[in-house]
């Protein structure tokens, strides 16, 4: 059976469309300028109703700012929290199970606050920091260090950040 010119053109068109769909993310890449994305620790507050002798709940507010010319989002922020220079633990703020259209939108030239509950468990080595947080968390020098996955329509980049409050 010989393939005629019309069938050959049809097969070629189908292959071209399939290759365009498969290779589109590789061909069109939205470059994210990570220097135009900032992540700041803007608030750490003790939730008083949850304070116990075993565990403290701290509400962190991270402010993400996007100075790029297109909308971005984040799927995951991993961080380590420090109180007066001492590490009190690590945590993850994740939107990975949320569809892309439900994740926090970082619009161009705009900032968005993200709140996350950080659980700090009592330990003998951190007893002094634990009691200081329970008595007055505003007198503590808070700092944070971590990484965030920043996404555009076709690109995923990792942004390293650190900040002090």
Task: Show where each model-derived region lies.
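Asparagine-centered strand-capping/turn motif at beta-strand->loop junctions
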Residues: 62-68
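Short, solvent-exposed loop/turn segments enriched in Ser/Thr/Gly
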Residues: 54-61
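Short, hydrophobic/aromatic beta-strand segments
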Residues: 70-78, 90-92
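Short structured motifs
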Residues: 42-48, 98-102, 127-131
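Beta-strand signatures of extracellular beta-sandwich domains
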Residues: 78-82, 145-147
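Membrane engagement elements in two modes
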Residues: 1-53, 149, 153-165
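Terminal connector regions
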Residues: 120-165
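Intrinsically disordered, low-complexity Pro/Gly/Ser/Thr-rich segments with frequent PxxP/GP/PP motifs
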Residues: 85-126
């Amino acid at each position: 059976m010989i393939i005629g010119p019309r069938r050959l053109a049809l097969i070629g068109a189908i292959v071209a469309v399939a290759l365009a769909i498969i290779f589109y993310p590789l061909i069109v890449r939205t470059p994210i300028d990570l220097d135009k994305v900032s992540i700041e620790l803007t608030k750490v507050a003790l939730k008083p109703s949850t304070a116990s002798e075993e565990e403290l709940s701290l509400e962190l507010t991270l402010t993400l700012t996007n100075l790029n010319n297109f909308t971005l989002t984040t799927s995951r922020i991993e961080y380590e929290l420090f109180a007066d220079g001492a590490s009190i633990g690590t945590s993850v703020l994740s939107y990975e199970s949320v569809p892309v259209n439900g994740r926090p939108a970082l619009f161009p030239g705009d900032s968005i606050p993200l709140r996350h509950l950080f659980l700090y468990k009592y330990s003998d080595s951190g007893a002094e920091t634990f009691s200081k947080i329970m008595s007055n968390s505003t007198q503590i020098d808070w700092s944070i260090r971590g990484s965030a996955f920043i996404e555009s329509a076709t690109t995923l980049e990792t942004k390293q950040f650190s900040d002090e409050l």
